[in-house]
Curated annotation (Swiss-Prot):
Coiled coil: none
Record gene name: lrrc28
Keywords: Leucine-rich repeat, Repeat
Record's keyword annotation contains Transcription: no
Family matches, as Pfam families: LRR_14 (PF23598), LRR_8 (PF13855)
Name the record gives this protein: Leucine-rich repeat-containing protein 28
The keyword Acyltransferase appears for this protein: no
Domain of life: Eukaryota
LRR repeats (start-end): 16-36, 42-63, 66-87, 89-111, 112-133, 135-156, 158-179, 181-202, 204-226
Organism: Xenopus tropicalis (Western clawed frog)
């Protein structure tokens, strides 16, 4: 086996191969033949599926500087060294079916990375540096132990496909609604009890899957007429305690995101002073940003600045920005034309989040 491996690598070096297949070789360490002398300067794609690797060499980028694809599916890799960030041409990295518990911040240095697959590992969190992957199009994080997603993920403005099925997520950051290129979002099999108010507002987002989030009972009305998967949602009894606000309509009780401070009703004709102040400040803030001649830096508390940059949501009737209070209106899925598509497999409702009693009274999902 060792002779055959050395021969394969030697031929690849001599003939300047661009692709090298070392799958199913029972390797428990990275082959030294790949790293000796100048390495394989011409190699672009390296496939090492179903081996027993536990880590990667520190000088990988130095010896294989032109790698565009690194396929390490089904190994025993526990950590990835910081040197991974030096693979400046890498476009595709697959570390699925390994034993990763931590993803090093240097992953954010892979400026050319388009596809990152980390399915079936032991990740509990992601470094915020992942937001630096400006070219990233596909991110698959299925079957990990993630309890949250970094807000900075919204900076991956090329991201088209995000999959976080079978994790431990109780919520997702509202900032993800700013992913302008996102076409498909899959969050099945988590612990979601609510979704961001603006989810589905982007026209680019066409496919959303939230199946088997048993406590999830409300879908933002922006998702109506999208392709949605919501089987197994809407448990009739709460399975775990949570501190989310909820509102009741008939026999239905729907949780709202944790950022919502209060819930208005059809009889609340006067907006809270804090909400009015934030809406006025937001208008000034937007005008300030549009004034190209203004060079004065904005000096505001971090939490306030983040809220102005990414409001709680936008009214589903008139698009007014909302910051503390929402006026919700329920449309049970079973009472819409979409009921036939789901055939009783879900008990969710569409929720229109409005900015005032006027919008609440005039919003109609089916018109």
């Amino acid at each position: 086996m060792a002779f055959e491996l050395c021969h394969t690598i030697s031929v690849a070096r001599l003939e300047k191969h661009k692709n090298l297949f070392l799958n199913y070789r029972n390797l428990n360490h990275f082959p030294l033949e790949l790293l000796k002398d100048e390495g394989l300067q011409y190699l672009e794609r390296l496939y090492m599926k179903r081996n027993s690797l536990t880590t990667l060499p520190e000088n990988l980028a130095q010896k294989l500087p032109n790698l565009v694809e690194l396929y390490l599916h089904s190994n025993n890799i526990v950590f990835v060294p910081e040197a991974i960030g030096s693979l400046v041409k890498l476009q595709s990295l697959d570390l699925s079916n390994n034993a990763l518990e931590i993803l090093c911040p240097d992953i954010g240095r892979l400026k050319s990375l388009r596809h990152l697959r980390l399915t079936n590992n032991r990740l509990k969190f992601l470094p915020p540096e992942i937001g630096k992957l400006k070219e990233l199009q596909t991110l698959d994080l299925s079957t990990n132990h993630l309890v949250s997603l970094p807000e900075k993920l919204y900076q991956c403005q090329s991201l088209q496909y995000l999959t976080v099925d079978r994790n431990l997520l109780c919520s997702i950051p509202r900032q993800l609604c700013q992913l302008a290129s996102l076409n498909e979002l899959s969050m099945a099999g988590n612990r979601l009890a609510s979704l961001p108010l603006d989810l589905g507002r982007s026209r680019e987002l066409q496919y959303v899957y939230v199946d088997n989030n048993v406590q999830l009972k409300g879908l933002p009305s922006y998702l109506y007429n999208k392709v949605i998967g919501c089987s197994g949602c809407g448990s009739p009894v709460p399975l775990t305690e949570n501190k989310l606000l909820s509102f009741t309509s008939g026999q239905l009780s729907i949780h709202v995101p944790a950022e919502v401070k209060s819930i208005g009703s059809a009889t609340d004709f006067v907006l809270p002073l804090q909400e009015l102040a934030l809406r006025s400040l937001h208008a000034i803030f937007c005008s300030f940003l549009q004034d190209l001649s203004c060079t004065t830096p904005i000096s505001l508390p971090k939490s306030l600045l983040e809220l102005l940059q990414c409001p709680l949501g936008h009214c589903h009737r008139c698009s007014q920005s909302m910051f503390t209070i929402v006026y919700p209106k329920l449309f049970p899925l079973r009472e819409t034309p979409m009921a036939g598509l789901h055939q009783g497999r879900t008990a969710v409702s569409f929720v229109a989040y409005c900015c005032s009693t006027q919008c609440l009274q005039t919003f109609d999902l089916l018109s």
